[in-house]
């Protein structure tokens, strides 16, 4: 296959596993030092020794007892040397990473602690969450009826859920940023240091060209199964549907295993399916999943056709058409994120009504 984005899959798993850890493993425990909890959560950001660390997804994937995951026991089995801090918009805080990917060099939206970079906010939230899980005091929440109860350890006195904040923030600051503001912005008609067109230049000894690989890495951050158009929205969101599809994955190549690199819905792609399914019976149904996938597939076909010419070349006209597809996919992806934010706002309004 000329398609590969294993590094992106590893990062999808790091984010998903972090959310699972915070929701299901992290508990209020004064006997465990704050710094130990910070280290446990920071692992998912910095990926220290991740190559030999066990993934958690095999525990929480739907119908886990009947699923065999392909080469996914450790993060290194999926892709070696991966982390999130080197891919977050604005860089790693030490001058490295994606320092040029913070649009206009400006980060705003969170006043507490005055974080100057996204990574600063991530570290701040980890510290806050660790302290919250170590203070021995349960957060009490009061619902719209006046009833009170102890909140989950992720929730602070202001009602802020750090698991949700971390997961959704990283999906934007890493996945959406990298997908749309990095890989999809590759100069696909450029040339390498040897003067070879990117559409013709092999990426090392791999079976794909440089241009194809960069595009596929952008798709990897969206997170859909490669045959995502074969799924219904309810299947992609792992809600219901045909037995072989209803859990958000499908053994497409019939090898008896689920390959997270190609046969599973992560992150943004699953959220798009949720928005589409949730709006299907309303007056203004959305189809974000199709609006993202169709132009991505069309753009990838243009690259494939160009790479397989007798003399590989991406013409100006072909690149212009491909850029139109990339634009449409990126805008639909962003609209899906906005719709998800509105969905949660509506949830809050319903809860307090």
Where in this protein do the model-derived segments appear?
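Mature extracytoplasmic or organellar-lumen-exposed domains after removal of signal/transit peptides
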Residues: 1-353
């Amino acid at each position: 296959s000329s398609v590969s984005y294993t590094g992106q899959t590893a990062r999808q798993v790091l984010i998903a596993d972090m959310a699972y850890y915070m929701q299901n493993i992290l508990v209020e425990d004064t006997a465990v030092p704050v710094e130990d909890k910070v280290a446990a959560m920071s692992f998912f950001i910095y990926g220290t020794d991740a190559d030999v660390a066990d993934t958690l997804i095999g525990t929480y994937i739907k119908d886990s007892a009947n699923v065999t995951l392909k080469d996914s026991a450790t993060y290194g089995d999926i892709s070696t040397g991966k982390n999130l801090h080197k891919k977050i918009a604005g860089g790693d805080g030490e001058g490295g990473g994606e320092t040029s990917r913070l649009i206009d060099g400006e980060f705003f939206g969170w006043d507490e602690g005055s974080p100057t970079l996204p990574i600063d906010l991530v570290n701040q939230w980890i510290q806050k969450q660790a302290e919250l899980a170590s203070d021995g005091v349960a957060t009490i929440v009061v619902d719209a009826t006046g009833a009170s109860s102890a909140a989950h350890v992720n929730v602070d006195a202001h009602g802020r859920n750090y698991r949700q904040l971390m997961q959704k923030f990283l999906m934007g600051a890493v996945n959406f940023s990298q997908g749309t503001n990095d890989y999809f912005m590759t100069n696909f008609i450029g040339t390498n240091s040897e003067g070879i067109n990117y559409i013709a230049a092999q990426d090392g000894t791999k079976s794909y060209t440089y241009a194809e690989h960069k595009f596929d890495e952008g798709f990897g951050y969206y997170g859909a199964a490669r045959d995502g158009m074969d799924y219904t929205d309810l299947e992609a969101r792992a809600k219901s549907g045909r037995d072989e599809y209803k859990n958000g994955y499908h053994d497409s190549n019939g090898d008896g295993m689920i390959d997270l690199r190609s046969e599973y819905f992560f992150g943004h792609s699953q959220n798009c399916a949720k928005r589409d399914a949730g709006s299907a019976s309303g007056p203004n149904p959305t189809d974000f999943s199709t609006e993202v996938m169709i132009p991505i597939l069309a753009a990838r076909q243009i690259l494939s056709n160009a790479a397989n010419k007798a003399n590989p070349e991406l013409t100006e006209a072909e690149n212009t058409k491909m850029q139109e597809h990339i634009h449409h996919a990126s805008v639909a992806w962003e609209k899906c994120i906005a719709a998800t934010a509105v969905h949660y706002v509506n949830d809050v309004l319903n809860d307090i009504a």
